[in-house]
């Protein structure tokens, strides 16, 4: 499971012109499910997202987590993050989970996030989405579980 974490001042996701998820300060995370993933990987990714220290403390040091600052968490499914780009001029998606597994694990991740954190929003799995964000920093990390 992969998560592209971006610290944002605000972000929203639209589907067909309708806002389906939005947060103020927090983390926008693009999530890719891979074929061998299970709920265990989803749990580990969520733990890292909630506790990864990417927000600045009073001294300007990245020392605070999403939980510490009470920020929002916007989860967006993005199977293209699992692409194999090592060869050729066209990405291969054989390294991405089948849609049914991707949907199941993304939904599980979302439900667990909502159970463990107050401010959680998401895009719509499998939809053509427009993601709007204001990067903060920018601070971006690729997490692979």
From Swiss-Prot:
Catalytic reaction equation(s): glycyl-tRNA(Ala) + H2O = tRNA(Ala) + glycine + H(+); a D-aminoacyl-tRNA + H2O = a tRNA + a D-alpha-amino acid + H(+)
One Gene Ontology term, aspect cellular component: cytoplasm
Chief place where the protein resides: cytoplasm
Enzyme Commission number: 3.1.1.96
Gene Ontology molecular function: D-tyrosyl-tRNA(Tyr) deacylase activity; Gly-tRNA(Ala) deacylase activity; Ser(Gly)-tRNA(Ala) hydrolase activity; tRNA binding
Keywords: Cytoplasm, Hydrolase, RNA-binding, tRNA-binding
One Pfam family, short name: Tyr_Deacylase
Intracellular or extracellular location(s): Cytoplasm
Sequence motif Gly-cisPro motif, important for rejection of L-amino acids, location on chain: 137-138
Keyword Cytoplasm listed: yes
A single BP term in Gene Ontology: D-amino acid catabolic process
Main enzyme class: hydrolase
Family matches, as NCBIfam families: D-aminoacyl-tRNA deacylase
Family statement: Belongs to the DTD family.
Functional description taken from the UniProt entry: An aminoacyl-tRNA editing enzyme that deacylates mischarged D-aminoacyl-tRNAs. Also deacylates mischarged glycyl-tRNA(Ala), protecting cells against glycine mischarging by AlaRS. Acts via tRNA-based rather than protein-based catalysis; rejects L-amino acids rather than detecting D-amino acids in the active site. By recycling D-aminoacyl-tRNA to D-amino acids and free tRNA molecules, this enzyme counteracts the toxicity associated with the formation of D-aminoacyl-tRNA entities in vivo and helps enforce protein L-homochirality.
Domain comment, as recorded: A Gly-cisPro motif from one monomer fits into the active site of the other monomer to allow specific chiral rejection of L-amino acids.
Self-association state and partner proteins as the record states: Homodimer.
Protein's UniProt name: D-aminoacyl-tRNA deacylase
Organism: Pseudomonas putida (strain ATCC 700007 / DSM 6899 / JCM 31910 / BCRC 17059 / LMG 24140 / F1)
Gene that this polypeptide is encoded by: dtd
